[in-house]
Swiss-Prot record:
Annotated GO MF terms: L-carnitine CoA-transferase activity
The name this protein goes by in its record: L-carnitine CoA-transferase
Source organism, top-level taxon: Bacteria
Disulfide topology: none
Length: 406
């Protein structure tokens, strides 16, 4: 059995080998999650051109930490042979490309399973591996998936739809690749038979936008978009402005509505036909007093600082939070207590700061053990790990099929 590459053993996925081929965010985000949970993750990059994410000044140090960097042309014959040899010792392979791009270039699921019948293969693309030919081969990024899925049209303000930001479809799709690959791996361990997963980014976002779509599919009702960050249906829910910034709150519950009505001068409406006893939500449209409730809330909040508002809402057991700015995050006591922001060393020895590993495993925690590797940094070690000699590696490099760091 091939030994794993040198790395600390930690996390719930220690001993699992994951290989991914993909650039930017969606596919690599799946690899990032696996790597932070203890899997040995090998990142395949183009020999001539590194992953375009490397041009960003700081983000790659987060998104590519804990990885092993392999620079290999997997579509040329000798490079393809090395790739297939690597697949023999791989548990999960993730590729992100335009539709069935790998199959078109001869790397089908069946070819991969010839080399490893237990392999879990996750294909991540904008429109899926099959379907209408006018879509399946199209490139897709975050906004494309949001627009095509019905997700984008639900977001923004009543005057204009806006994409959810930053890069929501990429992260949702990457996490879908992570979870579905783990589900498949669990089944493989029971049956010994590999699995192929077809992840279409637009279908991921279709599912993420499902809540109000059901009203249309089953009743023909189109949900309006938010107005200045407020829930399109329920008053007292959403984004509100105070004297010194913004909060969000959710006025939900019998007691909560009764008490907030008293605070803002609407106690006389309680128990009326419009706001009967036991009301748990105030419908912005159906309740005749929905707009009055909103106006009174705006007036009440605008004349108070955030600290006073949050204190009172807490007393009323109304869920609420200040809208934190990025500079406020790392000094927040909850962030400090849970070490939500952390630091690690880059490969050049510099300190990098960013989000910590999530979620927090109690018995087998994740770990940050290395920064982003250089382009081709681990090619030599990976090829030796699967049985290549120094001479064979040099031949691949001389032919432009692999890149190593001397």
């Amino acid at each position: 059995m091939t030994e794993h590459l040198p790395m600390p053993q930690f996390g719930p996925l220690a001993g699992v080998r994951v290989v991914f081929s993909g650039i930017e965010i969606a596919g690599p985000f799946a690899g990032q999650m696996f790597a932070e949970w203890g899997a040995e993750v090998i990142w395949i990059e183009n020999v001539a051109w590194a992953d375009t994410i490397r041009v960003q000044p700081h983000y790659p140090q987060l998104s590519r930490r804990n990885l092993h960097a392999l620079s290999l042309n997997i579509f040329k014959e000798e490079g393809r042979d090395a790739f297939l040899k690597l697949m023999e010792t791989t548990d999960i392979f993730i590729e992100a490309s335009k539709g069935p791009a790998f199959a078109r270039r001869g790397i089908t699921d069946e070819v991969l399973w010839e080399h490893n019948p237990k392999l879990v293969i996750a294909h991540l693309s904008g429109f899926g591996q099959y379907g209408d030919p006018q879509y399946t081969n199209l490139p897709a990024y975050n906004t494309i998936a949001q627009a095509f899925s019905g997700y984008l049209i639900q977001n923004g303000d009543k005057d204009q739809p806006m994409p959810a930001f930053p890069y929501t479809a990429d992260y949702f799709s990457g996490m879908t690749a992570t979870t579905s690959a783990l589900a498949a791996l669990y089944k493989v361990q029971q049956t010994g038979k590999g699995e192929s997963i077809d992840i279409a980014m637009y279908e991921v976002m279709l599912r993420m936008g499902q809540y109000f779509m059901m009203d249309y599919f089953n009743g023909g009702e189109i949900c309006p978009r938010m107005t200045k960050g407020k829930d399109p249906y329920y008053a007292g829910c959403g984004l509100y402005r105070c004297q010194d910034g913004y909060i969000v709150m959710e006025v939900v519950g019998i007691t909560q509505i009764e008490e907030i009505f008293k605070d803002i001068g609407l106690a006389h409406l309680l128990g009326t036909p419009e706001v009967p006893k036991g009301t748990q939500l105030i419908h912005r449209i159906n309740c005749p007093h929905g707009q009055l409730f909103e106006d009174k809330l705006d007036e009440w909040l605008a004349n108070q600082p955030i600290t006073a508002v949050l204190k009172r809402l807490s007393e009323l057991n109304i869920a609420s939070a200040k809208v934190l700015t990025i500079p406020e995050l790392e000094g927040n006591p909850q962030y400090v207590a849970r070490e939500s922001i952390t630091q690690w060393k880059t490969m050049s020895g510099e300190t990098c700061k960013g989000p910590n590993i999530m979620p927090k495993f109690k018995n087998n925690p994740g770990k940050i053990w290395r920064g982003m590797p250089a382009h081709g940094m681990d090619t030599n070690a990976i090829l030796k790990n699967i049985g290549y000699s120094d001479e064979q590696i040099r031949e691949l490099v001389d032919k432009g099929l692999a890149k190593i760091v001397e």
